[in-house]
């Protein structure tokens, strides 16, 4: 009887131990599963947050690109307006210089015309002196060659200036100038001077008219505004 009781007790203890072990294992597994589930939830929430952040960033990037594009368009428009403004200023300054409202200076050339130093006996004196036509020829040649401003004996010329010979003097816009006559021009001397000295050109023609003529480069030709010149 005792043997049966011992066997029964052992069996009960074995079953109890198994149940306890099984319960512990299940509890451990459940805890592990719960922890994994919680970790997965955290990872999912984090991943979802990252996706939302990326979506938000893309939205901001798009807005930034649109604003940058607007800024570039505004800059280009401003550059164009600025360029047009400077072009207008430049054209206005050129026009003011052309009509003689402003004083100008720069490199250029000076052409000096003088009456012939020797007049053969019996020859007509008028054939050996400087006339307005000679001065006109020089002035026109300089303008054609790109002169920005021209003066005769320091007096600025305008688009409607007149030059008239009156005996030994030449009248420019009502102001008389005695010989020699110096025609000054502001412009590229490497263009102006060759245009005068070309073979068979103006200087050769003037020499054939018995006019003493010389042309030289000048580093700094200065001209006053026309209104001040006429004062």
UniProtKB/Swiss-Prot annotation:
Coiled coil residues, start to end: 44-94
InterPro entries noted in UniProt: DUF881
Domain of life: Bacteria
Induction info: By vancomycin.
Signal peptide: 1-34
Keywords for the protein's UniProt record, in alphabetical order: Cell cycle, Cell division, Coiled coil, Signal, Sporulation
Pfam families: DUF881 (PF05949)
Biological process (GO), any one: cell division
PANTHER family reported for this sequence: UPF0749 PROTEIN RV1825 (PTHR37313), UPF0749 PROTEIN YLXX (PTHR37313:SF2)
Family, similarity comment: Belongs to the UPF0749 family.
Stated role: May be involved in cell division and sporulation.
Protein name (Swiss-Prot/TrEMBL): UPF0749 protein YlxW
The organism of origin for this protein: Bacillus subtilis (strain 168)
């Amino acid at each position: 009887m005792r043997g049966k009781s011992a066997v029964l007790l052992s069996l009960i203890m074995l079953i109890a131990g198994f149940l306890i072990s099984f319960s512990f294992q299940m509890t451990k597994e459940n805890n592990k599963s719960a922890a994994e589930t919680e970790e997965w939830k955290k990872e999912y929430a984090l991943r979802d947050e990252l996706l939302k952040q990326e979506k938000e960033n893309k939205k901001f990037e798009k807005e930034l690109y649109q604003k940058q594009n607007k800024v570039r368009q505004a800059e280009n428009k401003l550059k164009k307006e600025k360029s047009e403004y400077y072009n207008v200023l430049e054209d206005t300054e050129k026009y003011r210089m052309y009509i003689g409202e402003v004083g100008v200076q720069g490199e250029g050339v000076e052409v000096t015309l003088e009456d012939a130093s020797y007049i053969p006996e019996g020859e007509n004196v008028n054939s050996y002196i400087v006339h307005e036509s000679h001065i006109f020829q020089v002035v026109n040649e300089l303008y054609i060659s790109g002169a920005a401003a021209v003066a005769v004996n320091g007096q600025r010329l305008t688009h409607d200036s007149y030059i008239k010979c009156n005996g030994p003097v030449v009248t420019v816009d009502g102001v008389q100038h005695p010989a020699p006559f110096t025609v000054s021009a502001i412009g590229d001397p490497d263009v102006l001077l060759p245009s005068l000295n070309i073979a068979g050109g103006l200087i050769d023609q003037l020499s054939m008219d018995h006019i003493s003529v010389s042309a030289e480069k000048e580093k700094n030709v200065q001209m006053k505004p026309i209104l001040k010149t006429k004062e």
